[in-house]
């Protein structure tokens, strides 16, 4: 999708996208049709992505040239931020929280998961990222089929939301925020380090349209969807995202 960059026709507008469930099926690759549409959209407005995953996972889903293909790439909610292909900001969870508190949170999560009775458990239950922890009751290295089965199980048994409620009470004094996203996990980060964090890097753009699928209370798109600095659009799939953009931007 990479091409020589020209300024878009509308330099006052940014189309900012969540990744999982918005531009791609959860943890899967974007379709050629979606990527081609994003290329055309970038001729009209500035484009950007914001997600909880690190850059490596974003590249797996959207291609190895995403730093060239989008004007803004915000990994880990913008705690690792790129503008025009250049790294402009890195924030550290370990430095902010401190090793002792971080260790307490990780140990608590692992104990909770050890006692959790669910049909399947695999591996990588807590993933440490630069700006957050990603916690998965089933484990991140489950297969795609196991991922989908857990999502269905979680809808019925509220495994993640109950886990989050427990952690909120347990670490009330740590000023942490918990955000459920994707199919199998939730993120843990200091309050204010949700997706609205990335908006500080685009203050010069007056109109920001945000597109996301987890826009409900407790979802990881909720805060930025509700933020006064954005015009929020709730989507149900990559196809719905493209359709809404076509209507909005007359493409």
From Swiss-Prot:
Subunit annotation: Homodimer.
Native source species: Galdieria sulphuraria
Pathway stated in the Swiss-Prot or TrEMBL entry: Nucleotide-sugar biosynthesis; GDP-alpha-D-mannose biosynthesis; alpha-D-mannose 1-phosphate from D-fructose 6-phosphate: step 2/2
Compartments in which it is found: Cytoplasm
Entry annotated with the keyword Signal: no
Biological process, per Gene Ontology: GDP-mannose biosynthetic process; mannose metabolic process; protein N-linked glycosylation
Function: Catalyzes the interconversion of mannose-6-phosphate to mannose-1-phosphate, the precursor for the synthesis of GDP-mannose. GDP-mannose is an essential sugar nucleotide for the synthesis of D-mannose-containing cell wall polysaccharides (galactomannans and glucomannans), glycolipids, glycoproteins and the antioxidant L-ascorbate.
Residues annotated for Mg(2+) 1 binding in this entry: 18, 20, 213
Phylogenetic classification of the source organism: Eukaryota, Rhodophyta, Bangiophyceae, Galdieriales, Galdieriaceae
Active-site residues annotated for this sequence: 18 (nucleophile), 20 (proton donor/acceptor)
GO annotations of cellular component type: cytosol
Residues reported to bind alpha-D-mannose 1-phosphate: 27, 129, 140, 147, 185, 187
Listed name of the protein: Phosphomannomutase
């Amino acid at each position: 999708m990479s091409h020589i960059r020209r300024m878009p026709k509308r330099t006052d507008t940014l189309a900012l996208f969540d990744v999982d469930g918005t531009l791609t099926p959860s943890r899967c690759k974007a379709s050629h049709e979606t990527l081609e549409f994003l290329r055309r959209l970038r001729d009209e407005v500035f484009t950007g992505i914001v997600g909880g995953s690190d850059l490596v996972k974003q590249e797996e889903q959207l291609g190895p040239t995403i730093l060239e293909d989008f004007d803004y790439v915000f990994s880990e909610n913008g705690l690792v931020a790129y503008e025009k292909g250049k790294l402009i900001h890195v924030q550290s969870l370990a430095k902010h929280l401190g090793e002792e508190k971080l260790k307490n949170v990780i140990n608590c999560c692992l104990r909770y998961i050890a006692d959790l009775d669910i049909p399947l458990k695999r591996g990588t239950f807590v993933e440490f990222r630069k700006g957050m922890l990603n916690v998965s009751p089933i484990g991140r290295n489950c297969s795609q089929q196991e991922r989908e089965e857990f999502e269905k199980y979680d809808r019925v048994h509220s495994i993640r939301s109950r886990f989050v409620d427990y952690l909120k009470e347990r670490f009330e004094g740590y000023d942490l925020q918990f955000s459920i996203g994707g199919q199998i996990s939730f993120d843990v980060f200091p309050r204010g380090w949700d997706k609205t964090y990335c908006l500080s890097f685009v203050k010069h753009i007056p109109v920001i349209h945000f597109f996301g699928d987890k826009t409900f209370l407790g979802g990881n798109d909720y805060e930025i969807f509700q933020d006064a600095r954005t015009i929020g659009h709730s989507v149900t799939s990559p196809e719905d995202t493209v359709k809404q953009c076509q209507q909005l931007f007359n493409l």
